[in-house]
């Protein structure tokens, strides 16, 4: 599933081509996504100028003059900026049509994504209860320490809770906990403030590196230019169960936490 870095890479890739342009409408070939596409999407966006493209967690938000288009890439979605006349491929479900023969095309084979019209994005149920951004100022060691006090939930599940912090999915939770030397099974309430300081720095370092390298392509994700993300070449633990730890050489261990594959080093992570 595309996580924060992949959504940010997408935003950075499409923003220069579309910001400030006027929409001419939309083509919805299949509205049956995880959340159905609005029946009146074309009418709502037609004639409006795209003022800004921003990201909130794993959501991409296209702010128009009146209202916002929310896009979630789901498990397998990606976006491309193309000529409106570009051949339509299987699973090209939605086109947002812009002036000068451009379109933003949403491709989603597994249809777990979303393209929604929001009248008031900041107060929409999908967004209003989200935690802070991991690359923002609110996200810090003291914040995590206070939110984790007396909680027995494994720190990996705690870190992946979008009400605590947004956008840290399975890949980057694994990598951040390894970088911080914290056992993913450890209860969130049993981590001291200095260790949370290491974790916050690790999360930021890992996410920033992933964005710089174009995200992580494991199967479905491609950048808006059609290329792959190369952070997968830097993965220290994710997908490496049984292989030697890059720090100590011990075999990496695998366990499921919250139903998600979790890889860690029993020697380096405590």
UniProtKB/Swiss-Prot annotation:
A zinc finger (FPG-type) spans 236-270. It catalyses: Hydrolysis of DNA containing ring-opened 7-methylguanine residues, releasing 2,6-diamino-4-hydroxy-5-(N-methyl)formamidopyrimidine; 2'-deoxyribonucleotide-(2'-deoxyribose 5'-phosphate)-2'-deoxyribonucleotide-DNA = a 3'-end 2'-deoxyribonucleotide-(2,3-dehydro-2,3-deoxyribose 5'-phosphate)-DNA + a 5'-end 5'-phospho-2'-deoxyribonucleoside-DNA + H(+). Binds 1 zinc ion per subunit. It comes from the Bacteria. Its EC number is 3.2.2.23, 4.2.99.18. Its cofactor is Zn(2+). CDD domains: EcFpg-like_N. One of its GO terms (biological process) is base-excision repair. GO terms for molecular function: 8-oxo-7,8-dihydroguanine DNA N-glycosylase activity; class I DNA-(apurinic or apyrimidinic site) endonuclease activity; damaged DNA binding; zinc ion binding. DNA binds at residues 91, 110, 151. Keywords: DNA damage, DNA repair, DNA-binding, Glycosidase, Hydrolase, Lyase, Metal-binding, Multifunctional enzyme, Zinc, Zinc-finger. It holds the Pfam family Fapy_DNA_glyco. The active site is at residues 2-3, 58, 260. Monomer. Involved in base excision repair of DNA damaged by oxidation or by mutagenic agents. Acts as a DNA glycosylase that recognizes and removes damaged bases. Has a preference for oxidized purines, such as 7,8-dihydro-8-oxoguanine (8-oxoG). Has AP (apurinic/apyrimidinic) lyase activity and introduces nicks in the DNA strand. Cleaves the DNA backbone by beta-delta elimination to generate a single-strand break at the site of the removed base with both 3'- and 5'-phosphates. HAMAP family: Fapy_DNA_glycosyl. Belongs to the FPG family. This is Formamidopyrimidine-DNA glycosylase. It comes from Acidithiobacillus ferrooxidans (strain ATCC 23270 / DSM 14882 / CIP 104768 / NCIMB 8455).
